[in-house]
């Protein structure tokens, strides 16, 4: 069986739809100086959003202090999923230390603990919210 290409403009409806879908580009948000576009990530509700890493690396502080710091610069601490993407694609933007996520541990036996990401070994775990860890902030933009 030979595979012959169709002449340009002679496509079936499903092929045209597929080509149109491939041509669609996601409009990327404008970045401020020092910001790094991380990518599109979905939240637990399945909504897609852009994630942008903000400039600045905050020294060791408690979880609540880091949450407040991130908010003060117009951001939030990364989620656990966002941390995995940051580890995989932007590890060079982090010290080889542990960084707070924005997620407290929801297990009642671990009240007062929150999730963190290490950028040395790459593991995730929980630490007491009174512990002092580093932080980076992200901003999220919902994709309409």
Regions found by a protein language model. Name each.
Residues 2-75, 116, 120-121, 129, ...:
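Extracellular adhesion/carbohydrate-recognition regions
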Residues 80-144:
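C-terminal, surface-exposed recognition/capping segments
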